[in-house]
């Protein structure tokens, strides 16, 4: 009985060392040895991560704006306001660093609003929330 041998690459067992190696190869112009397949995978992952972060922060921002505007719980106002300021700042930083993500922000706004609206209506059913932004 023969065992199938699986070739384990640097990428598979030490991601940080793999990154350092690829960066070094790119800087030195050693493009022949760059692990292109995994580099593309990592770059796609980064792009997706940034979009997910924008959507996540947008949902948190919308949630806390809705709660602050429509939920009559004065003891919670300060915490909601702090979260609103923090999320606005973080979103501004992300969009300043990657202006192309503004399109994703705009495109995902309605979906994020609808998602959050369901949650706040469920959590605070005694308060009326608007159907649209």
Regions found by a protein language model. Name each.
Residues 1-60, 66-133:
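Surface/interface-facing alpha-helical segments and adjacent flexible terminal/loop regions used
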């Amino acid at each position: 009985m023969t065992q199938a041998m699986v070739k384990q690459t640097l990428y598979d067992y030490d991601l940080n060392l793999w990154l350092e190696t690829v960066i070094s190869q790119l800087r030195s112009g050693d493009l022949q040895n760059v692990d292109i397949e995994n580099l593309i995978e990592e770059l796609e992952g980064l792009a997706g991560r940034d979009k997910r972060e924008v959507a996540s922060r947008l949902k948190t921002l919308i949630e806390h704006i809705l709660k602050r505007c429509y939920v009559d719980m004065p003891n919670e106002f300060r915490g909601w306001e702090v979260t609103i300021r923090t999320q606005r700042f973080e979103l501004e930083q992300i969009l300043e660093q990657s202006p192309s993500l503004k399109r994703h922000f705009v495109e995902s706004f309605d979906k994020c609003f609808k998602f959050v609206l369901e949650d706040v209506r469920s959590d605070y059913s005694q308060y009326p929330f608007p159907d649209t932004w």
